[in-house]
Amino acid sequence: MVKRIGMRRLAAFAAAAALVLGLVGCGGAQSTAQGNTEPVNLSVWTYYNGDQLESFNKLVDTFNNTVGKEKNITVESYSQGSVNDLETQVMAAAQGKVGASAMPNIFMAYADTAYAMDQMGELADLAPYFTDEERAAYVDSYLTEGDFDDSGSIKIFPVAKSTELLFLNDTDWKLFAAATGARYSDLETVEGLVKTAEAYYNWTDAQTDTPNDGKALFGRDAIANYMLIGAKELGETIFDVKDGKMTMGLSEDVARKLWDNYYVPYIKGWAAASGHFRSDDIKIGSILAYIGSNSSATYFPTQVMLSDTESHDIELKVLPTPHFEGCEKVSVQQGAGMAVAKTTDAEVEASVVFLKWFTQPENNIAFAVGSGYLPVTHAANDMDAIHSSGLALTGNMENVLMEAVDAVNTNELYTTKAFEGGTDARSKLNYSMSDIATADRATVEERLAAGESAEEAEAGFLTDEYFEAWYQSLCDALSQYEG
């Protein structure tokens, strides 16, 4: 069901008031709507829900009551539900399917969807509407994500981004740390995380007389991110894209490193994934920590529910995502941007006015604080600027933004370039390791229940031959997407 946007005026952000991006015409860029004599109505489709939708709602109506009113532009925003629902609706509109809605002026899109729409000739290039100075205000990699042909085009405009962090049930961690001497710094590397996970499994196993009933320490929301970013830190690019054509770049050595630090700990019970999201697993106490998007922070539970009658309150500790030891740190760049449909000049110009306004520091910070996402300009990606905004930060949101902003400002950011079939290829990568790990752990648990030792139950899954068979099957699956 589509949902109409709500309304609220926001306080001005005094510290960044001087940075007004594109609300007046600048030399070198196509001028944007300077007070249209004819009203322009814009439709925006998103997949936002919950806090993120509420935060977006407030800003849209602020625009309508201020700059939009001045320039005769009205924005109407609709949530299409989920990411998949939005992609389906946009594609149906673009293809003119019977019963489909009219194409929106602006819609949220990930790179692969936007690339497909661009190949259909549906997207406007926003580059002519930005001066070099205006472009320089944005985090560069956020803009280049929408430059499909490396010509400097802007086919996806960034409005909010995210990266990954480690979210920890600090309450129960402290019990483990007090008993074993474990430290937060042990979780700074992937190798340290796995070693600590082994210690946590053994420590929890020793709490009962039942053998092999230890608990997993961690989980991951996106295995594809782990593999893509891990490979990048280890010197390889799994999806190497040039001119829209992908060449797979994953050596057996790097694949083995990735395997040893997720599949192996998973089948040993040191890592786990059972709920739809790892925050669900935190809630039932099956894991103590997870690596996931900073935008997932609002879903971190405040209680662990061990049963219908047993629960306890927990506190969140936010830490940087673990990186591979001895490697340059790479952080994932994720989050959909806004694509503008190729319609009339007046509508495209009005769309740019709205997007520039939305990404002014005071407005972008307001959205980030309300939703857990990150601002997209250099000026707004700064904790001093966020504090100066005057907007209230909860303790958790303060820590989330601090760690995420630090990752963006200090680490290399990486996201895959768009290519035909990219969404399906990423899905195959995502499930290639997680599905086999889940199935094999279930087999191990059956064998343990039948009386086998852990060594006996796991042995067949830890051989070189077993890894090599998986690696070859992955290469075969991904090779069909090569250009």
Predicted regions and their residues:
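Extracytoplasmic/periplasmic substrate-recognition and gating elements
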Residues: Q95, I267-K268, S307-H378
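Short, solvent-exposed loop/beta-turn-alpha elements that line the ligand-binding surface or hinge
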Residues: A127-Y138, A182-D186, P211, A216-F218, ...
